[in-house]
């Protein structure tokens, strides 16, 4: 099942959010405010560690080896290059936004925990949000493309649109299989089964 968790990114405390109509839809532009920079930094610092290591992993290191070792565990997973740090942060913000502001969708895993190397970008769909129908147990998917740039230009939007259009606009089979496998590792069998059904039975 999908169990929501309260986001601690607190975007509304440090970002200005503006909705702009686009045909029958709208786009939401969120901009960090300079006057609230300290709040944004504090909120971000609180969420970043959990995207690279599970709470259980950190707690175990803390209990067995103490604070310096637990800190070293997280430090060893954080990217050291500016480009990868920026890209990872885009995925982290996207995940947190989905959980808090997407109208019921949830990102069921924090996929940065499974990076091959801290200074390598992960391949595949950036973030997949999932909404499960309480009656039918069928899933709806929110495919996400996270871009990290200094300025939101038309070119950035074009690149993001191209990423979203891959696989016919649907989540890739690889991305869904990856999520399903990780959910099995986490003993979330019902959601893993529902994803496998969507992929193999319903052919989304």
Predicted regions and their residues:
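Short, solvent-exposed loop/turn segments that connect beta-strands within catalytic domains
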Residues: 133-139
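Charged, often glycine-rich, active-site loop that binds/positions anionic groups
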Residues: 117-129
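Nuclease-adjacent, charged terminal/linker segments that flank catalytic cores
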Residues: 1-66, 72-81
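Buried hydrophobic packing segments
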Residues: 94-102
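A short, highly charged nucleic-acid-interacting micro-segment common to nuclease
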Residues: 74-95, 112-117
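Conserved catalytic cores of phosphodiester-cleaving nucleases, focusing on short active-site segments
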Residues: 98, 127-129, 142-148
